[in-house]
UniProtKB/Swiss-Prot annotation, chains A, B:
Binding site for Mg(2+) 1: T50, D51, D129
Species annotation: Prochlorococcus marinus (strain SARG / CCMP1375 / SS120)
Signal peptide annotation: none
Family, similarity comment: Belongs to the thiamine-monophosphate kinase family.
Protein's UniProt keywords contain Secreted: no
Extra remark beyond the main annotation: Reaction mechanism of ThiL seems to utilize a direct, inline transfer of the gamma-phosphate of ATP to TMP rather than a phosphorylated enzyme intermediate.
Keywords noted in UniProt: ATP-binding, Kinase, Magnesium, Metal-binding, Nucleotide-binding, Thiamine biosynthesis, Transferase
Transmembrane intervals: none
Single GO BP term: thiamine biosynthetic process
UniProt name for this protein: Thiamine-monophosphate kinase
Molecular function, one GO term: thiamine-phosphate kinase activity
Length: 333, 333
């Protein structure tokens, strides 16, 4: 064990040139030789998003290996593109800083995860930069073409259905399982739910299929406008952000919270569903006819409430304001 | 003084939402409300570049205030776009991490510098992300359209002239002046040179005008191909990178090193010219006719040597290999 650690290559031994040389295999030929990457003309509107992921703030080696970290970084970004009407992923750039004592195998693992996600969801590794830094930090910028659908948080209208593309709270449960949190032992969590939860935490899927189905379901005569965001900061935060940007009230039906089939009942489990975060599902506000078509076409979607005129907030159908219960407010400062 | 420090707002007091709220003034309306930024269709090839800048590796508060840091981050990126044939800057995204104890005024200053550079060189602030982190880190991704010129490091050909768009070593001298390095006191540095050097260090200019002139000078019958890179990692490194990518030898004329008119003589000063770095000038390999036209059209350019067949290295015209002399190898690990 000691021997292995001693002979492990670290970034300091390699230096910047050799690191870039080794990253060549993940790039298209020639891109690493120039100062920029070239992107062919798409003749379409583009959407762009940047996410900054910092060790011990956004990820931890206890619960996610380097492969997962790379995969999640891409999935997080593509989830943002999806809820903005993505048509085709063009690619990503990667800024990476890490202490010079970091093993090369860590960087290699992160890039392997990045490449695996790009292979699955499309897009190229367009280049990037690496630097020495005290804390492992990944900054990913993703670029894609925008399809015909205009998805903005501000497009919600009173009368709309509020729909999610899938169950919530799984990633948070996965985290607790990976940390052997006592709460996951106090209750009998079915094995299938455990599997789904850990996968949701380590290898989340951006809601690209859900978006494609949403497009196909649009009733012919309706304009190409809808309100959407993703639930990366939790379901409740997603709903509230639609309310804030569209200046209306969301009325959520407590018995229709989007839960996994095997989800246990209890306050903690409800809180995780509403505020667990890192769910990467679409949260969409849609006119009724379109909503019904999407619900029918995609069984994992769930109608959780309606939008109505009123102050920008989320309330239960009994009229009570939905209060945030968890400490985790995704306040990254 | 103590009172002022106590009442200074820090990021922890504001939280992520309030920070984003305050950054709104730097963005186009509405972009901060959505998960991504929308970019209109350009119907052209695009070029993209990402730079990761870490405090105490790439910048220091001793020599650069927050305004300078923001400006330099943009200039660094646009310099890379320029040496890849930039036509129009579309915009940038900014990933920023900083300790939660960082004063808001620091972030505000960085964004002020970023915006000033975009106002000068074009392009919008397209969005970004911010996070808590142990070390101040900026990750900027710049996107632009590519003009007709195909500038690649691999396009140098034997017989080409090697030309730089301006003098080298100024930024390194500026750094030494700002640090009160004894070497800058042992010699009488003219005031004008001091001014230019400090400005080159704190407020560098990407070589966009030089590129535009290069385009205008292209002889009619010649193909739109040339070799270029920028000298952000030093003049010698830029020359060597052209040699490596084009697999030929650069022969540099010692008496034609690109120096400021008032540049002192001596080994240290030659070393700074060749390896000081952060010069952000174009280093171009051009067929003779095109080279002569550019030299004539732009007085600050300088022909420093020729390319010839041979191994991928830089040598003096007396046949000696140019040796790296400085410790600063821009090895950021």
């Amino acid at each position: 064990m000691l021997k292995e650690e001693n002979t492990q290559e670290i970034l300091h031994d390699l230096g910047e040139q050799e690191i870039l040389n080794r990253l060549r295999k993940y790039m298209d030929y020639g891109q690493i030789d120039d100062d920029t990457a070239l992107i062919k003309s798409y003749k379409k509107e583009l959407i762009i998003n940047t996410d900054m992921l910092v060790e011990d703030v956004h990820f931890s080696e206890i619960t996610t290996n380097p492969n997962h970290i790379g995969w999640k970084a891409v999935a997080t970004n593509l989830s943002d593109l999806a809820c903005s009407g993505l048509e085709e992923v063009i690619g990503i750039t990667v800024g990476l800083s890490a202490p010079s004592s970091t093993p090369w195998s860590w960087v290699d693992g992160v890039y392997t995860g990045i490449k695996a996600a790009l292979n699955k969801f499309g897009g190229k590794l367009l280049g990037g930069d690496c630097s020495n830094g005290k804390q492992k930090t990944l900054c990913i910028t993703a670029l894609g073409t925008k399809g015909p659908l205009n998805l903005h948080r501000s497009n919600a209208r009173p009368g709309d259905y509020l729909i999610t593309s899938g169950p919530h709270g799984l990633s948070r449960l996965g985290l607790s399982l990976l940390l052997s949190d006592p709460i996951t032992k106090s209750i009998n969590v079915p094995n299938l739910l455990k599997e789904h939860a850990i996968k949701a935490h380590q290898e989340p899927q951006p809601p690209i299929k859900a978006l494609q189905t949403l497009l196909k379901c649009k009733p012919y005569a309706m304009p190409w406008n809808a309100a959407a965001t993703d639930s990366s900061d939790g379901l409740l935060e997603a709903i509230e952000s639609l309310c804030r940007s569209s200046n209306c009230t969301a009325v959520v039906d407590h018995k229709n919270l989007p839960k996994h089939a095997d989800w246990p009942s209890g306050k903690q489990w409800n809180d995780w569903c509403l505020e667990g975060g890192e769910d990467f599902e679409l949260v969409v506000s849609l006119p009724p006819n379109w909503a019904k078509a999407w619900l029918k076409a995609m069984p994992c979607t769930k109608a959780i409430g309606r939008m109505k005129e009123g102050p920008a907030k989320a309330m239960w159908s009994n009229g009570e304001t939905i209060q945030k219960a968890m400490d985790t407010k995704f306040e990254h400062f």
